[in-house]
From Swiss-Prot:
Family annotation (InterPro entries): GINS_A, GINS_bundle-like_dom_sf, GINS_Psf2, PSF2_N
Protein name as catalogued: DNA replication complex GINS protein PSF2
Xref: CDD domains: GINS_A_psf2, GINS_B_Psf2
Segments of skewed composition (Basic and acidic residues): 227-241
Ranges for region Disordered: 187-255
Length: 255
């Protein structure tokens, strides 16, 4: 199946909501529920009006059957949302510490269980919208400091990062191209021993007086066989004359 290029780079909002449903939330069951073993987690025995933490997708299913009541997260209380909004206004270069899927969870609770909120749903919805707008404005300002290596995105939510991803990736790729185009090639400097051209010109030489070039150590050679030594002529003649005296005369060997 062919998919548009823009959908390959980012997630759809529906996909992020689907992933957010794997997070857990507290509920108050209205009926007794038997424990259930699931692939990712095990659900304990549920008692009426006793808090249990379950995946959001199960809480949605139980809520539609009127078998439970949502317990909204603490950060979704009106007082906490106002405190988060004040922090966002007072700190133009920092983000408040909220849940990674805070936008998705807020929309799920406002859509599925608005009657379980401690404040009017419209007040909570307006506060969430104001917080999102302030954080979005600050994230756009932070994109001016992006470079080809990294972009600091501490305390940003999944939906916020997903909205910035196409612009950040494209900007970093262009910066990498500019850096590669402006980078000059540095000359390679060889040392005297590392130059490969010198190795090609080197030829073996013979006849050196160095003892390392001899196949036999010089200590085992007679002094007359060393390079550069000469034997006394008179001594050589004396040895030849002694050898001639010992050689038998021509005419046949002596028995």
């Amino acid at each position: 199946m062919s998919v548009p290029a823009e959908q390959l780079e980012t997630f759809l909002p529906s996909e992020l909501h689907f992933m957010a449903e794997n997070e857990t939330i507290e509920i108050l069951p209205r009926r007794v529920g038997n424990p259930i073993k699931l692939a990712g987690t095990d659900l304990p025995l549920m008692h009426p009006l006793r808090k249990n933490r379950v995946p959001i997708w199960m809480a949605i299913a139980l809520k539609k059957q009127q078998r439970c009541q949502f317990v909204p997260p603490d950060w979704m209380e009106e007082s906490n949302l106002r405190r988060i909004l004040a922090f966002e206004h007072a700190n133009p270069t920092a983000f408040s510490n909220v849940d990674f899927h805070w936008l998705e969870i807020a929309q799920i609770v406002l859509t599925t269980a608005p009657d379980d909120l401690t404040s009017p749903p419209q007040v909570i919805r307006n506060l969430v919208r104001d917080i999102r707008e302030v954080r979005e404005q600050k994230s756009r300002q932070g994109m001016k400091e992006v470079n080809e290596n990294m972009l600091q995105m501490d305390r940003l939510g999944a939906l916020e990062i997903n909205e910035m991803r196409p612009f950040v990736v494209e900007g970093m790729e262009e910066m990498i191209k500019i850096r590669k185009a402006g980078k000059k090639e540095e000359p390679i400097i060889y040392s005297e021993s590392d130059n490969p051209e010198d190795d090609e010109d080197d030829e073996p030489t013979y006849g050196h007086d160095d003892e390392s070039s001899l196949a036999v150590p010089s200590s085992q050679l007679d002094s007359s066989l060393r390079y550069g030594d000469r034997v006394d002529t008179s001594e050589r003649r004396r040895e030849l004359s002694q050898w001639d005296d010992n050689v038998p005369q021509q005419g046949g060997p002596e028995w």
